[in-house]
Amino acid sequence: MKKIDVKILDPRVGKEFPLPTYATSGSAGLDLRACLDDAVELAPGDTTLVPTGLAIHIADPSLAAMMLPRSGLGHKHGIVLGNLVGLIDSDYQGQLMISVWNRGQDSFTIQPGERIAQMIFVPVVQAEFNLVEDFDATDRGEGGFGHSGRQ
């Protein structure tokens, strides 16, 4: 298992609010919690930035972290990430903040310590562009946006 440096920025993390952990041996994501002093009510259509009380430093340029919504919150309550996916670069060292968006039709209250997002680590390949005048022909060519059909 890869070691990632984590800094606790809020003393409640690890005491009142558990550290992020994998729920099962097959879990891909670590749950991130709302490190709030008081509950926050999100009206339909509203967004807010929620602190996690944690900072990470991945350090390895072949890795990045991605923050994703929790499926139950999105499906049952319309609570997703305001930026849809949060990308954490390997050299970022600041607090992990979660942009939360209520795309549902009812107000939703985020409680202190509530699990509101998940974080996964993914490999990164940095590419170098090779400038060309033309591409080698393929069957697909420039077809996109539904080009391959629905069935």
Swiss-Prot record:
The gene from which this protein is expressed is dut
**UniProt entry tagged with the keyword Hydrolase:** yes
What are the record keywords, sorted? Hydrolase, Magnesium, Metal-binding, Nucleotide metabolism
Description of how the protein assembles with itself and partners: Homotrimer.
Q: Which InterPro entries match?
A: dUTPase, dUTPase-like, dUTPase-like_sf, dUTPase_trimeric
Q: What is this protein for, i.e. what is its function?
A: This enzyme is involved in nucleotide metabolism: it produces dUMP, the immediate precursor of thymidine nucleotides and it decreases the intracellular concentration of dUTP so that uracil cannot be incorporated into DNA.
Disulfide linkages recorded for this protein, renumbered to the chain, are none
Species, as recorded: Escherichia coli O139:H28 (strain E24377A / ETEC)
Protein's name according to its UniProt entry: Deoxyuridine 5'-triphosphate nucleotidohydrolase
Q: Does the keyword Magnesium apply?
A: yes
Q: Name one GO biological process term.
A: dUMP biosynthetic process
Gene Ontology molecular function:
dUTP diphosphatase activity; magnesium ion binding
Organism classification, top ranks? Bacteria, Pseudomonadati, Pseudomonadota, Gammaproteobacteria, Enterobacterales
- Recorded catalytic activity of this chain's protein: dUTP + H2O = dUMP + diphosphate + H(+)
